[in-house]
């Protein structure tokens, strides 16, 4: 299979008997596990292959291998799929179309609903809503499956207007708003129009290219569903919101001004303890924060580097995930092309480096664990592949399984058992 995995490739494999829904592997629950992979069409460090849309794979839980099931049709080839979220009921997949004008009306990006076929894991488009911002970079869903949150990144370049002040013409620069939008999930599983939108502070930070305005890059829910955390890499802010169960509003919590220039990007909550881990894109570091879901308070515990001290070339961390067992946290490095592994002290939240492992590809923009935590799947955007690693739950170490699949410009991996 070449780097440009297409529908033609899929049907060739089908004819060869290599893609068969009836032969899909069994997940631990007795259901079959499927992986859903987002592909970019445009963005920094674009990568290999003609990207766009979403690819579906069956997961062999004995080996961690991915077998192609389908790729979205030609109507989605221009869909710049930035991030994915699966409804906890396993019946719906939500995706961002990370563009500035999904409808050619310059009204920002979009969020799409796909219904997951409960027999073979395939997906079908079921609805679209505006994301309430430009370049929606992230989407997440709460544990009840009733609310979706979207982080809208905004452009790096401003719009330029000419205004007259006291009769004197002047140039005025207007940047897109960085926003966090909340969308209710309707009874049929599709998304309703946004019920609330938080507009991030219109300010700037250190870097004169990437930090001239707010850039919301992620928003995630704490396990109790009472608090959400949004990362603004443009202005070095971490925002918390109170989101009581059943509420469809974003009540302002606390705003943390991080160290200038570090660019907080993605977050991952500990499954049981009051810690959230945030990766910092411009500092090549990972921070642990302690939080109180009732008050939405948050405070810094520790920050650790994600690359070796002797590495001096360009690097920008991208993704972060706490292992399902809660003992380890992992971060991906674009540039060093690796995964940093840290052991978590459950009493304090402090991290100890376990090791740094190459991802066997370039630009690992995203990665994820299967729900059991047995395997880690690294999405190497730059080389257009997903590499499988076996996870040692006791030591946290990663071992390549030898399983690798070509996917055009992969940026996010999510799972559903059907």
Task: Label each residue range with its predicted role.
Residues 38-48, 96-107, 153-174:
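Short, conserved, GDST-rich strand-edge loop motifs in beta-rich repeat architectures
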Residues 58-64, 115-121, 183-191, 242-248, ...:
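Short loop/turn segments immediately following beta-strands, especially the blade-tip
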Residues 78-88, 133-143, 202-224, 258-275, ...:
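Beta-rich, blade/repeat-based domains predominating
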Residues 124-216:
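Asp-box/WD-like beta-propeller blade repeats and closely related beta-sheet repeat scaffolds
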Residues 69-74, 125-129, 204-209, 252-257, ...:
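A short beta-strand motif characteristic of beta-propeller blades
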Residues 1-18:
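N-terminal secretory signal peptides and thylakoid transit peptides that target proteins
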Residues 40-42, 98-100, 153, 233, ...:
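Short loop/turn segments immediately following the C-termini of beta-strands
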């Amino acid at each position: 299979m070449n780097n440009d995995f297409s529908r033609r490739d899929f049907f060739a494999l089908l004819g060869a008997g290599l893609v068969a829904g009836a032969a899909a592997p069994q997940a631990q629950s007795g259901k079959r596990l499927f992986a859903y992979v987002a592909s970019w069409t445009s963005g920094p460090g674009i990568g290999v292959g003609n990207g766009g849309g979403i690819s579906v794979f069956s997961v062999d839980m004995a080996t961690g291998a991915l077998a192609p099931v389908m790729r979205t049709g030609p109507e989605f080839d221009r869909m710049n799929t930035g991030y994915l979220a699966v409804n906890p009921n396993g019946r719906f997949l939500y995706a961002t179309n990370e563009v500035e004008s999904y409808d050619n009306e310059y009204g920002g990006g979009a969020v799409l609903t796909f219904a997951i076929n409960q027999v073979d894991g395939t997906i079908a488009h079921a609805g679209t809503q505006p994301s309430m911002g430009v370049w929606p970079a992230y989407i997440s869903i709460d544990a009840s499956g009733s609310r979706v949150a979207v982080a809208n990144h905004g452009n790096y370049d401003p719009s330029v207007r000419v205004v007259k002040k006291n009769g004197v013409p002047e140039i005025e620069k207007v940047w897109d708003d960085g926003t966090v939008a909340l969308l209710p999930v309707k009874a049929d599983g599709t998304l309703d129009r946004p019920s609330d939108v938080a507009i991030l502070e219109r300010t700037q930070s250190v870097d004169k290219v990437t930090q001239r305005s707010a850039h919301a890059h992620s928003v995630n829910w704490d396990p109790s569903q009472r608090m959400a955390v949004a990362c603004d890499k443009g202005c070095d802010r971490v925002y918390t919101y109170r989101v009581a169960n059943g509420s469809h509003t974003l009540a302002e919590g606390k705003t943390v001004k991080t160290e200038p220039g570090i660019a907080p990007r993605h977050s991952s909550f500990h499954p049981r303890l009051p810690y959230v881990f945030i990766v910092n894109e411009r500092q090549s570091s990972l921070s642990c924060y302690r939080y109180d879901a009732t008050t939405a308070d948050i405070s810094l515990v520790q920050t650790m580097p994600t690359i070796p001290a002797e590495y001096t070339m360009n690097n920008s961390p991208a993704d972060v995930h706490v292992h399902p067992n809660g003992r380890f946290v992992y971060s991906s490095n674009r540039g060093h092309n690796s995964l940093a592994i840290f052991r978590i002290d459950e009493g304090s939240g402090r991290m100890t480096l376990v090791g740094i492992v190459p991802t066997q590809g370039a630009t690992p923009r995203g990665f994820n664990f299967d729900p059991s935590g047995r395997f880690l799947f690294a999405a190497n955007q730059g080389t257009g592949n997903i590499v499988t690693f076996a996870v040692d739950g006791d030591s946290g170490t990663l071992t390549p399984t030898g399983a690798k699949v070509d996917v055009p410009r992969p940026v996010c991996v999510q799972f559903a058992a059907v």
